[in-house]
Curated annotation (Swiss-Prot):
GO terms for biological process: ubiquitin-dependent protein catabolic process. Keywords: Developmental protein, Repeat. It comes from Dictyostelium discoideum (Social amoeba). This is Ubiquilin. Residues 70-99, 215-325 are annotated as: Disordered. Stable protein which acts as an antagonist of nosA by repressing cellular differentiation after the tight-aggregate stage, when cells differentiate into two precursor cell types, prespore and prestalk cells, prior to the formation of fruiting bodies. One of its GO terms (molecular function) is polyubiquitin modification-dependent protein binding.
């Protein structure tokens, strides 16, 4: 019988008396009697190595009075429920609704989806059944189902029912229990007098209309999204020069290529758009393709101007003006403030796309989102151009376009790479005399860090992703990781992790969480 000292990651210390012939699994059971960590979640570290359950204490050369470190690991996944095999019908049913995730568990385990359901914006949304019902009616599949089933429409009008459904969606264990109950009910459905009739009505009244509406929508989208390059190409080679992609009148230059010669090009060009103009066009208009917005773009022997009588460019004056400099360009690294892979998964979800477009097209919801986010409200008050842009329905629709958001994410990653490589040192507080640049017109006016903070506060779902949207975001800690994670580094070194660079990298990626950092180091 020897005495082993136990030191947990929470700085709790105690000792146990064990025999050296027992296994590590039995050793964990003894430890579980003196701490709150279950045996299956214990990670015991000795001499920088994690102990395996089948090893004995003799094998690892542990002796009387030695100290081992105890870390709480992740809980093991629950075993899949055992289901009875039911006879499969001869006619095969459709596999699922097009555009809807086939595995709802994977979608609900997405951290971004969980943050969305836990946000105050979702709570306020469920308190107003009218807005929620309007969002559901905006989906053609759900609209057909609700029109054919008044009882379901009445359920969507009850805030209590909606809140109970939300609580179930927030709790993965509760949802799994509900799905197990549904599986058991389906197995025993033949014992219910009206079981098969209920199942038939559920299929004919709910599933079949959803399938029909979704198939029609998917067919129409496939028809409209056909590749125009493939359908319009002919066998003859194209000898025409490619037009300038950054020019606002590229269509006219492509149709008449000779008009772009130096002898025939006018010194002053203007374009008037009486319809809904491209909000991004005037950002790149003017001589030399400047990013000035068409107001102060003075090139060499060429002056460009736009007169948008329709939906004008709300970002023109933000990026325009002579020589303000690229103020706050360092904030582009934190633009959107989220993991690009998770954002990509969210953008590819058609349900999330419809919800986002619905939120952004509702002025009342946009105003509520601005009111609940003090940081966004302050930006609106200090920047009239941004407020005008957020009130522009066409611009909001373009902002919710998955292609545009993917492009913004790629721009974020590119700016982060440039900053990591030292191209943009010190946050790029301003690039001084950038007003000329051969007619580029300057890029002053708007602080990109404000634009990034706005999307960081919105959290990816129109203000719904950030659970702390009602509080002001704390300032970023500028201390080096060695000082910021000093205590965590000492704990890792005591546990036997001597690679300081790897420890700093793990702590930085986990934001100082010692347990997650240990899991990352042990992979």
């Amino acid at each position: 019988m020897v005495k082993i000292n136990i030191k947990s990651s929470t700085d709790n210390k105690f000792d146990v008396d064990v025999e050296l012939g027992i296994t590590v699994a039995d050793f964990k059971k003894v430890i579980a009697t003196k701490c709150s960590i279950p045996a299956d979640q214990q990670r015991i570290i000795y001499s920088g190595r994690i102990l395996k359950d089948h090893q004995t204490l003799d094998e690892i050369k542990i002796q009387d009075g030695h100290t081992v470190h105890l870390v709480k690991g992740a809980a093991p996944p629950p075993p899949p429920p055992v289901e009875q095999q039911v006879p499969t019908p001869s006619n095969t049913q459709p596999q699922g609704i097009p555009g809807v995730p086939q595995n709802i568990n994977d979608m609900m385990n997405n951290p971004m989806i969980q943050e969305m359901f836990n946000s105050r914006m979702m709570d306020s949304l469920l308190d107003n059944p009218d807005i929620f019902r309007d969002m559901m009616m905006g989906n053609p599949e759900m609209r057909e189902v609700l029109n054919n089933n008044p009882e379901m429409a009445q359920m969507l009008s009850d805030p209590r029912q909606l809140r109970q459904s939300l609580e179930m969606m927030r709790n993965p264990e509760l949802m799994r229990e509900m799905m197990r109950n549904a599986d058991r009910a389906m197995i025993n459905i033949e014992n219910h007098p009206e079981g098969f009739n209920l199942l038939r009505r559920m299929y004919t009244d709910i599933q079949e209309p959803l399938m029909n509406a979704a198939n029609q929508q998917a067919a129409s989208q496939n028809q409209t999204n056909s590749n125009p390059i493939q359908t319009n190409t002919d066998a003859n080679p194209n000898s025409q020069p490619l037009p300038n992609p950054w020019s606002t009148n590229s269509s006219s230059t492509s149709s008449n290529p000779t008009s772009s010669s130096p002898s025939s090009r006018p010194t002053t060009g203007s374009s008037t758009n009486t319809g809904a103009s491209n909000p991004w066009a005037s950002m790149f208009s003017g001589g030399g393709g400047g990013m000035g917005g068409g107001t102060n773009n003075t090139g060499t022997n060429n002056t460009g101007s736009t007169n948008n009588t329709g939906a004008s460019n709300p970002w023109a004056s933000m990026f325009g003006g002579g020589g303000g400099g690229m103020g706050g360009m360092g904030g582009m690294e934190g633009m959107l403030g989220m993991d690009p892979e998770r954002v990509q998964q969210l953008l590819n979800n058609p349900v999330a796309q419809q919800m986002m477009q619905r939120l952004m097209s509702d002025p009342a919801m946009m105003q509520q989102m601005i009111t609940m986010n003090p940081q966004l409200r302050q930006m609106m008050d200090s920047n009239p151009q941004l407020r005008e842009a957020m009130n522009n329905p066409e611009f909001l629709n373009m902002m919710t376009n998955p292609e545009n958001m993917n492009a913004m994410m790629q721009l974020q990653q590119a700016m982060g790479t440039l900053r990591n490589n030292g191209v943009f040192p010190g946050g790029m507080g301003g690039m001084g005399g950038m007003g000329g640049m051969g007619g580029m017109g300057g890029m002053g006016g708007m602080d990109f860090s404000q634009f990034g903070n706005m999307f960081g506060g919105m959290g990816g779902m129109g203000g719904m992703g950030n659970n702390n949207s009602s509080t002001t975001r704390p300032p970023v800690n500028q201390e080096p990781p060695e000082q910021r994670f000093r205590l965590q580094l000492e704990q890792l070194e005591e546990l036997g992790f001597v690679d300081r660079a790897a420890n700093i990298s793990a702590l930085t990626s986990t934001n100082g969480n010692i347990n997650l950092a240990i899991d990352r180091l042990l992979r």
